[in-house]
Amino acid sequence: MGDPLQDRTRRLLTDYILFCARAPNTPEPLPTSVEAALLRSVTSQIQQEHQDLFNSFRDYQGNRLELVTQMADELLSNDQEFNWGRLVMLLAFVGTLMNQDRTVKRRRDQRNRLLLERDCYLIVSLLYNRLTGRHRSWLEAHGGWDGFCQFFKNPLPPGFWRRLLIRAILSCFFATAIFYIWKCL
């Protein structure tokens, strides 16, 4: 039998990201676990509360993996600042990027669908490695995915999410601007 934390982490990330990237008009698949259902619910609330901000990334045409890596570097930088809120904020952002295929032109649908599927698996792998590597001790100390479920039983005040979201988005914009300037030089 494998490592339960690794198994649950991979299953949760795969469930959530493929759920977000499903084709338009596709029925919503059932969540694969309690934590998957809760993650979908919490990220949906965050995306709705900050719809204008998240929608600005909905049609992102750049490299999704690079952008997620930058955002993960900002939000999951070290164990001292890592928390469930930062993780959920990152996953809400990832979910928004994965939803962007809904605006793709018909004649390029298949190519873009393949790129989206590739990005899904690369992003699952990136986040899985971060969570089960760098942040494994934090996850274990906070009860793993059972701790995640316990934490989100009682919702946090909107001010917490607003501050976290603003800091995350500003960091991402700053990182993207520096990356863009660096590429142009």
From Swiss-Prot:
InterPro entries recorded: Bcl-2-like_sf (IPR036834), Bcl-2_BH1-3 (IPR046371), Bcl-2_fam (IPR026298), Bcl2-like (IPR002475), Bcl2_BH2_motif_CS (IPR020726)
Primary location: mitochondrion
SMART domains cross-referenced by the UniProt entry: BCL
Coiled coil: none
Subunit structure and binding partners: Interacts with BAX. Interacts with BCL2, BCL2L1/BCLX. Interacts with APAF1. Interacts with ITPR1, ITPR2 and ITPR3; the interaction with ITPR1 is increased in the presence of AHCLY1. Interacts with AHCYL1. Interacts with HIP1R (via ENTH and I/LWEQ domains). Interacts with CASP9. Interacts with BCL2L11/BIM. Interacts with BIK. Interacts with UBQLN4. Interacts with NME2/NM23-H2. Interacts with and PMAIP1/NOXA. Interacts with TPX2. Interacts with UBQLN1; in the cytoplasm. Interacts (via BH1 domain) with BECN1.
Protein role: Promotes cell survival by suppressing apoptosis induced by BAX but not BAK. Increases binding of AHCYL1/IRBIT to ITPR1. Reduces ITPR1-mediated calcium release from the endoplasmic reticulum cooperatively with AHCYL1/IRBIT under normal cellular conditions. Under apoptotic stress conditions, dissociates from ITPR1 and is displaced from mitochondria-associated endoplasmic reticulum membranes, leading to increased Ca(2+) transfer to mitochondria which promotes apoptosis.
Family affiliation: Belongs to the Bcl-2 family.
Name used for this protein in its record: Bcl-2-like protein 10
Organism, as annotated: Rattus norvegicus
